[in-house]
Design a protein with these regions (language model features):
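Bacterial signal peptide processing site
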Residues: 21-23
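Extended, aromatic/histidine-rich regions of cofactor-dependent oxidoreductases associated
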Residues: 163-166, 234-238, 251, 257-259, ...
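C-terminal motif of bacterial Sec signal peptides marking the signal peptidase cleavage site
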Residues: 16-19
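An exposed acidic His-Trp-rich patch
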Residues: 111-126, 215-264
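Bacterial N-terminal signal peptides that target proteins for export
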Residues: 1-9
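Forkhead-associated
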Residues: 56, 61-127
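Flexible, glycine-rich surface segments
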Residues: 176-236, 241
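Surface-exposed beta-loop interaction hotspot
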Residues: 131-199
Length: 309
């Protein structure tokens, strides 16, 4: 081989390696499948936990007034018949929501009986949850409006729940993506399943990735050390939850690269009950593509019950 030609070939190889960057490590398919199956097991375990989404049986939005709570049908907030006819009153005041317990009725906070307690909301440093027999309730605050969320730790829906339906595991939906940061992280308005209510998380930038030879982009928000994606795709019409799905990704390295794994995408809590306030996919986060990976939707795994304004 001509010496000059050999040097030219070597130079081209070096330039190609530098231009392409480090090669992606080959995916161990068996280990990857085991990872996804472990993730699915953890997902179901969290759903079935006492304070998971499946024990939620009621959501009641509150104005500044007094509400009676109990199993008596005449109560402002009616709970299952396993509870006392009149548990007490929720008094919504400028300083918060006070629970005043009916005399002779046992309500516990951290295992200790209480007769009156200020119900600090879930947005506070020390939120309060109280229990009565199999029931528990707490106050949630969503950018101003407040509600009482009720759980039943003996809810029969939990016993009959499952299994969660999934698409087959497909490594093609585990993609390398890139975060293109905004000049400054920005607050974005995100609609929720509650009409008129929005959330206002922080978005660091736009994530771009490629699927089936086409480039797409999503706007994630910051969730602790991770990026949180609320996305929609063409499967929302028939096989996945209509309002979209969730997926998390580890924050990118200094090069802005991250792994976005749609095999770990899952249905939001509102796919399982009517008592959640989850965000829905924004128009910019709806992808014109069928992402046939991750969790699917099954109508029989949704509990409606009652939710009152």
């Amino acid at each position: 081989m001509n010496k000059s030609f050999g040097c030219l070939v070597a130079a081209i190889l070096v330039i190609s390696i530098v231009a392409c960057g480090p090669a992606e490590p080959k995916l161990d398919l068996a280990a990857y499948e085991a990872e996804i199956m472990e993730w699915r097991g953890g997902r179901l375990e969290r759903l079935l936990a006492p304070n998971g989404y499946l024990t939620q049986i009621g959501l009641h939005w509150l104005d500044e007034r007094v509400y009676t709570i109990g199993s008596d049908p005449g109560s402002d907030i009616v709970v299952p018949a396993t509870a006392a006819a009149r548990i007490g009153e929720l008094r919504v005041a400028p300083d918060g929501v006070w629970l005043v317990v009916e005399e002779g009725v046992e309500v516990l906070q951290d295992g200790e009986p209480v007769s009156e307690v200020l119900m600090a909301a879930d947005t506070s440093e020390n939120p309060v949850m109280v229990t009565h027999r199999s029931l528990a309730w707490s106050i949630i605050e969503r950018d101003g409006p407040i509600a009482v969320r009720i759980r039943d730790y003996e809810h029969p829906f939990v016993d009959t729940f499952g299994p969660l339906p999934y698409y087959d595991i497909d490594p093609a939906y585990r993609v390398t993506a890139e975060l293109k940061k905004y000049d400054e992280p920005r607050t974005v308005a995100v609609d929720t399943v509650i009409e008129g209510f929005q959330q206002f998380p922080i978005a660091p930038g736009i994530v771009t990735f490629e699927l089936n030879g086409q480039r797409y982009e999503l706007e994630p928000t910051i969730s602790g050390e991770k990026l949180f994606f609320v996305f929609g795709d063409e499967t929302n019409r028939d096989e996945t939850y209509g309002a979209g799905r969730f997926v998390y990704a580890d924050s990118p390295g200094e090069d802005g690269r991250l792994v976005l794994d749609f095999n770990k995408s899952y249905s939001p809590p509102c796919a399982f009950n009517d008592f959640s306030t989850c965000p829905v996919a924004s128009p910019r986060n709806r992808i014109p593509l069928r992402i046939e990976a991750g969790e699917r939707f099954a109508p029989n795994l949704h509990y409606s019950g009652t939710a009152t304004p």
